[in-house]
Amino acid sequence: MDISKIDLKADEKAVTKSIFKATYEMWMDNLEVDVVIVGGGPSGLTAGRYLADAGVKVLILERHLSFGGGTWGGGMGCPYITVQSPADEILSEVGIKLEEGEDGLFVADSVEVPAKLGTGAIDAGAKVLTGIVVEDVILKEGKVSGVVINSYAINKAGLHIDPLTINAKYVIDATGHDASVACTLARKNEDLGLVIPGEKSLWADEGENGLLKYTKELFPGLFVCGMASNATHGGYRMGAVFGGMYISGKIVADMILEKLKNE
C-alpha cells in the first residue's frame, strides 16, 4: 500500500444515505424470523450459533453495545473464566484456546471467549443487533409470537416513545440473572399464573447442573436458557464457571430445532 497516493473520499450525504439504506434493508429482512434470542451473553451466543448453523433464521438482540454478557471481566476483574468438560468442546469449535486448570477445569481468556463466540454466531449466519432492548413480548392466542423492541438509549433516557415489534416462531430469554423477558410476561399477564422466584445464592455444582435441568420451554413460544433458566426456577448462581451456560445454549438450540423439524 502506497500511502502517498491515497486520497480518501467521504461525502457526508453518501455516508448518511449508505447507512440509512443498509439499515432499512436489514430491518426489512429481520421483521419476521424463526427465532429471536434476547441477550447476547454466553448461552445466547451459543444457541444462536447452533441454530444459525442449522439454517434457522436467528436474530440476537443485545441491549448493550457489545455482546458477551459478563464474560469480559472474568472473575472479579481477573481476565480468565473456567469451564468443564464437555463444554470445552463448544469453545474449541470456534477456536478458543484452553489451558488446564484445577480439579478438571479448563481456563480460557475472558476477552477471547466472547469475541470468538460472537463472531462464530455471526459467521454461522445469525444477525446480532446491539443497543436494542426488549421491553415486552407479542402474546397472541396463548403463545409468545415475537418481541416488542425499542432503542436502549431511548429507554435509558426515559423518553415516552412507542416501540416496534419483531415476529418470531420462538423467543429465547437469554437475559441472564434478571430473566427480564420471562419476568415481564409474568408481571403483565397475571392470569397466566407464571411465578418467577428468582435465583438463589451461590452453589457452583448445583447452579451448573440446574442450568441443564431448567433449560426448557417456560411458556408456549418462550424458552429460557443460561442464568435466566435458573432465575425462573429458583436455581443457584455459580460464579465464574461457565460450562453450564454454553451447554444450556446448545440444549435450547436442540430443543427448538426439534420443534421446527416437527412443524
From Swiss-Prot:
<dbReference type="InterPro" id="IPR036188">
    <property type="entry name" value="FAD/NAD-bd_sf"/>
</dbReference>
<feature type="binding site">
    <location>
        <position position="237"/>
    </location>
    <ligand>
        <name>glycine</name>
    </ligand>
</feature>
<keyword id="KW-0479">Metal-binding</keyword>
<feature type="binding site" description="in other chain">
    <location>
        <position position="134"/>
    </location>
    <ligand>
        <name>NAD(+)</name>
    </ligand>
</feature>
<keyword id="KW-0808">Transferase</keyword>
<keyword id="KW-0408">Iron</keyword>
<comment type="function">
    <text>Involved in the biosynthesis of the thiazole moiety of thiamine. Catalyzes the conversion of NAD and glycine to adenosine diphosphate 5-(2-hydroxyethyl)-4-methylthiazole-2-carboxylate (ADT), an adenylated thiazole intermediate, using free sulfide as a source of sulfur.</text>
</comment>
<feature type="binding site" description="in other chain">
    <location>
        <begin position="62"/>
        <end position="63"/>
    </location>
    <ligand>
        <name>NAD(+)</name>
    </ligand>
</feature>
<dbReference type="Pfam" id="PF01946">
    <property type="entry name" value="Thi4"/>
</dbReference>
<protein>
    <recommendedName>
        <fullName>Thiamine thiazole synthase</fullName>
        <ecNumber>2.4.2.59</ecNumber>
    </recommendedName>
</protein>
<feature type="binding site" description="in other chain">
    <location>
        <position position="70"/>
    </location>
    <ligand>
        <name>NAD(+)</name>
    </ligand>
</feature>
<dbReference type="GO" id="GO:0009229">
    <property type="term" value="P:thiamine diphosphate biosynthetic process"/>
</dbReference>
<dbReference type="InterPro" id="IPR002922">
    <property type="entry name" value="Thi4_fam"/>
</dbReference>
<feature type="binding site" description="in other chain">
    <location>
        <position position="180"/>
    </location>
    <ligand>
        <name>NAD(+)</name>
    </ligand>
</feature>
<feature type="binding site" description="in other chain">
    <location>
        <position position="227"/>
    </location>
    <ligand>
        <name>NAD(+)</name>
    </ligand>
</feature>
<comment type="pathway">
    <text>Cofactor biosynthesis; thiamine diphosphate biosynthesis.</text>
</comment>
<keyword id="KW-0784">Thiamine biosynthesis</keyword>
<comment type="subunit">
    <text>Homooctamer; tetramer of dimers.</text>
</comment>
<comment type="similarity">
    <text>Belongs to the THI4 family.</text>
</comment>
<feature type="binding site">
    <location>
        <position position="162"/>
    </location>
    <ligand>
        <name>Fe cation</name>
    </ligand>
</feature>
<dbReference type="InterPro" id="IPR022828">
    <property type="entry name" value="Thi4_prok"/>
</dbReference>
<feature type="binding site">
    <location>
        <begin position="160"/>
        <end position="162"/>
    </location>
    <ligand>
        <name>NAD(+)</name>
    </ligand>
</feature>
<dbReference type="GO" id="GO:0009228">
    <property type="term" value="P:thiamine biosynthetic process"/>
</dbReference>
<keyword id="KW-0520">NAD</keyword>
<feature type="binding site" description="in other chain">
    <location>
        <position position="177"/>
    </location>
    <ligand>
        <name>Fe cation</name>
    </ligand>
</feature>
<dbReference type="GO" id="GO:0016763">
    <property type="term" value="F:pentosyltransferase activity"/>
</dbReference>
<dbReference type="GO" id="GO:0005506">
    <property type="term" value="F:iron ion binding"/>
</dbReference>
<dbReference type="GO" id="GO:0052837">
    <property type="term" value="P:thiazole biosynthetic process"/>
</dbReference>
<feature type="binding site" description="in other chain">
    <location>
        <position position="43"/>
    </location>
    <ligand>
        <name>NAD(+)</name>
    </ligand>
</feature>
